[in-house]
C-alpha cells in the first residue's frame, strides 16, 4: 500500500506537467493559426485595391497619408518618410485628389509626425490649404477609425507602403469605408524582413481590435474637411 501511495504521489506531478504542456501547445497553435489567418485574409481581400500607377486610382477622394517618423533610429532621414511624401505629392499633382489628411503620432513633446509631413509636402508644392492634420493617429487602426468618425470620410485613398496599405484597406472594409490605396516605394534587404515580421504581429493585433471594435485612444469633436 505504501509503495502504491508513493507511486501516485510521484505520478501526479508528471500528469500536471503533461497537462500544462498540452495547454501551452494548444495556445501556441492557436496563436500561429491566428497570425496565419489574419495575414492571408488581409492580403487576399486587398488584392487589386493597391495601385502603383496614379491612372488607376479613383478620383475625387480624400487621400489619407499614414504617418511615420521623419528620422530613423540613428538620426538619419527615414526612407519610409521620404517615399510616402513622394507618393502623396505625386498623387496630389496628378489631380486625383484635392485634400490630404495626414494622420500620425504627436503624443510626446518634440515628436510631431503630421507637422513634419505637412512641411515636407509643402516643400513638394502641395498647398497648405489642401492639407488637414490628425494629431491622434497613434496606430493605423486609430487613423482609419478617426478618418471616418472624426473627419467624416466614407471613401479614401490610403497612401503608405504596400504592406501597410493592405492592413489599412482591410480595416477600412470592416468599418464601412470604401478605400483604395496608392503604394509608396518600399525598401529591400534585411529591413524588409524585420518589418514583415512586425507586420504579421500588427495584423494579429488588428484582428483583435476589429473583433471587439475598440475605439481609438481619442475621438473628440468632428472636424469638417
Language model segments and positions:
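N-terminal targeting leaders characterized by basic, low-complexity, disordered sequences
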Residues: 1-4
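Active-site-proximal helix/loop capping residues that flank conserved catalytic or ligand/cofactor
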Residues: 31-34, 86, 202
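A structural signal for short, hydrophobic/glycine-enriched beta-strand patches
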Residues: 40-196
Amino acid at each position: 500500500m505504501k509503495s502504491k501511495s508513493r507511486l501516485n504521489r510521484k505520478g501526479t506531478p508528471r500528469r500536471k506537467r503533461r497537462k500544462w504542456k498540452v495547454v501551452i501547445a494548444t495556445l501556441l497553435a492557436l496563436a500561429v493559426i491566428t497570425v496565419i489567418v489574419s495575414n492571408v485574409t488581409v492580403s487576399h481581400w486587398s488584392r487589386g485595391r493597391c495601385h502603383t500607377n496614379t491612372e488607376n486610382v479613383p478620383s475625387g477622394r480624400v487621400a489619407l497619408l499614414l504617418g511615420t517618423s521623419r528620422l530613423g533610429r540613428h538620426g538619419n532621414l527615414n526612407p519610409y518618410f521620404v517615399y510616402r511624401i513622394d507618393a502623396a505629392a505625386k498623387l496630389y499633382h496628378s489631380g486625383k485628389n484635392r485634400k490630404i489628411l495626414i494622420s500620425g503620432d504627436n503624443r510626446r513633446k518634440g515628436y510631431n509626425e503630421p507637422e513634419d509631413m505637412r512641411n515636407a509636402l509643402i516643400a513638394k508644392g502641395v498647398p497648405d490649404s489642401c492639407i488637414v492634420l490628425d494629431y491622434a493617429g497613434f496606430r493605423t487602426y486609430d487613423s482609419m477609425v478617426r478618418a471616418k468618425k472624426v473627419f467624416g470620410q466614407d471613401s479614401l485613398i490610403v497612401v503608405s507602403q504596400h504592406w501597410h496599405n493592405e492592413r489599412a484597406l482591410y480595416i477600412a472594409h470592416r468599418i464601412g469605408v470604401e478605400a483604395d490605396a496608392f503604394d509608396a516605394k518600399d525598401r529591400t534587404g534585411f529591413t524588409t524582413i524585420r518589418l514583415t515580421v512586425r507586420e504579421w504581429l500588427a495584423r494579429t493585433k488588428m484582428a483583435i481590435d476589429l473583433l471587439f471594435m475598440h475605439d481609438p485612444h481619442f475621438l473628440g469633436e468632428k472636424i469638417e474637411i
